[in-house]
A protein has these predicted regions:
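Juxtamembrane regions of bacterial inner-membrane/periplasmic proteins
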Residues: 2-237
Length: 237
């Protein structure tokens, strides 16, 4: 048994430790690189291109825009719709997680509690699914994003890679497709409608809006008024 430990387990343990260290180093360097370089592609886009769902177009639409070319209303709308404590939390909204757990345990419709940081990590680096491995990697990358990027960069990347409809990636492509409007000129109502489709962009359309999107966008507008521009100032600081 001592010989087995010496010649098998110890070398195997060293290899595993080197692999873990290499993975950590690689992921840190990758996140640092994407802090200053806009990603030419991302995991969610690659999955859609390789395994297109029903209704996916032959060519996708995407155009990267910097934060200063995105309407403040659009930035506020996605915070109001998806993650109202975005500026305050460190990547994980434990209050929202508790509310979602209570809701789900009480027999309500299953509700998630992913923050914008977690959604950015998932769309940028990971595959779809609900396995514990993927959730663990999502948490790891979300932590790295919070440690190595600022909130402004996280929101910018999110708005440039999220899918607003079949093959419509990013807010610039979405604004032009649905409203014929660039991202920097989107109105509050247009922004609210775009944010309203994010739970399921294959089921809902920003224009023409379904009754659900109309109700959801009115709720988002109300939340935007309550949050005010102070939320964006906190993100940009």
């Amino acid at each position: 048994m001592p010989l087995i430990k010496r010649y098998v387990f110890r070398p195997l343990l060293k290899v595993m430790l080197w692999l873990v260290a290499g993975w950590i180093g690689f992921s840190v360097l990758l996140v640092l690189l994407l802090k200053v370089v806009d990603p030419p592609f991302w995991s969610w886009l690659v999955q859609r291109e390789l395994f297109p769902p029903s209704g996916y177009p032959d060519e996708y639409a995407h155009r990267w825009v910097a934060t200063d070319r995105i309407s403040p209303a659009m930035r506020l709308a996605v915070i109001a719709a998806e993650d109202q404590r975005f500026a305050a939390h460190s990547g994980f909204d434990f209050k929202a997680i508790k509310r979602a757990l209570d809701h789900n345990l009480n027999g309500g419709r299953v509700r998630g509690a992913s923050t914008l940081t977690q959604q950015t990590a998932k769309n940028l680096f990971l595959w779809s699914g609900r396995s514990w491995v993927r959730k663990g990697l999502e948490a790891w990358f979300a932590l790295l994003l919070e440690l190595l990027w600022d909130k402004r960069r996280i929101l910018e990347v999110y708005l440039n890679i999220v899918e607003f409809g079949p093959g419509i990636y990013g807010i610039e492509a979405a604004g032009r497709y649905y409203f014929g409007t660039p991202a920097q000129a989107l109105s509050s109502l247009q922004a609210a409608r775009l944010a309203a489709v994010l739970p399921n962009p294959y089921r809902y359309r920003a224009n023409p809006p379904s009754p659900y999107v109309q109700r959801r966008s009115q709720w988002i507008l109300q939340q935007m008024r309550q949050l005010g521009t102070i939320s964006l100032k906190a993100v940009d600081d």
